[in-house]
A protein has these predicted regions:
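Extended ligand-binding clefts on enzyme/binding-domain cores
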Residues: 1-138
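Conserved small/polar residues in nucleotide/adenosyl-binding loops
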Residues: 141-148
Length: 148
């Protein structure tokens, strides 16, 4: 870790705990995560009228979860789960919703019939997911991101 030497044991423990949390927060089939979730990984479904609406969807702020999983693997390669998860994310978008406009999704992949507000961010997220992916789609989004 790149922290002060006296803080490294704490940050190493925090990184390990964060990786374990993500295994709970990311959906077992799609790899998607909600914007907000409880400590047990369950999507936060309350207060849907606060902070602009629902936060139990794969939407906006949750894109960075997938991006950060890619970055964590690129820097540390500490857990092969990162690769498994990001392969699921890319498979979801490339097989389940191939050639469709990006929408808002529940983390199980259910489509919310509203357009994604940040489609370029979704392309960039899927490209960054490739840092921790080895599936058949890992190069597709990197070229898509370069085209944007």
């Amino acid at each position: 870790m790149w922290a002060n030497e006296e803080d490294r044991p704490f940050w190493k423990k925090a990184a390990k705990a964060s990786r374990e949390y993500l295994k709970k927060a990311c959906h077992k089939d799609t790899g998607l995560a909600a914007e907000y979730a409880y400590y047990d990984g369950t999507p936060y479904e309350k207060e849907q009228d606060v902070f602009g609406g629902r936060h139990d969807w794969y939407y906006s702020d949750s894109y960075r979860v997938i991006a950060n999983i890619g970055l964590d693997y690129e820097w540390f390669a500490a857990d092969e789960w990162n690769v498994e998860n990001n392969n699921k994310v890319q498979k979801f978008f490339c097989e389940t919703h191939k050639d469709e406009e990006f929408k808002i999704y529940e983390i199980d992949g259910t489509v919310i019939e509203q357009p994604a507000l940040h489609p370029v961010a979704m392309i960039a997220t899927n490209a960054q997911a490739s840092l921790a992916a080895n599936g058949p789609y890992c190069l597709l989004y990197t070229s898509d991101a370069a085209d944007e």
